[in-house]
């Protein structure tokens, strides 16, 4: 696995910095994942600061130079869009992808279906290439577009540890979520991977997931 190479390249040095790593943190995940990140980073001796934002605003911060040092929770493949980032080891949680149909509740929909996605939901970019996707600013706008017949489906994402959404929302799939950091933070990445490996081997990683993320 590529992240093991980082351990070999950088070593296993304990890291502590006066300046905390700034992590873009989608507001849907902040309260749930903060304790998990606190335990992980704390054991590695790394300070951090969460920057709450919408999914779309978080991506703007990632694109801006020196605005943040990474993203707290994104699905696999986020580094393909932002190659200066590195996926840090094993998944930390899961997100559920929900869809609300206008008429036909069958998923996947037929070709030509117009799908509305809230801005910043990477899953739509990766898996809906065969459909016409309309990007929406928020759920309120999305529901309005759905009810007016401007879109056939509305897609949203939320932590899988939260209660399932009621009908007419349908759970389409679940995706694993990872921490992503700027590759330039080599020492911090190595320290986090070292701690993660220890936590996985001694069962602490799973225990943290069960403690903080009850659905996993």
Question: Can you describe what each PLM-predicted range is?
Answer:
Residues 3-12:
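Sec-dependent N-terminal signal peptides
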Residues 12-18:
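Sec/Tat signal peptide C-region and signal peptidase I cleavage site
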Residues 21-39, 101-136, 142-144, 148, ...:
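Bilobed "Venus flytrap"/periplasmic-binding protein-like clamshell domains
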Residues 39-43, 103-106, 110-113, 117-119, ...:
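Extended ligand-binding regions for polar small-molecule ligands
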Residues 46, 63-73, 147-156:
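Alpha-to-beta junction loops
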Residues 49-61, 134-144:
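Short helix-initiation/N-cap motifs at beta->coil->alpha
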Residues 51-112, 119-123, 160-172:
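Acidic, polar ligand-binding/catalytic clefts
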Residues 91-98, 163-197, 201:
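Periplasmic-binding protein-like
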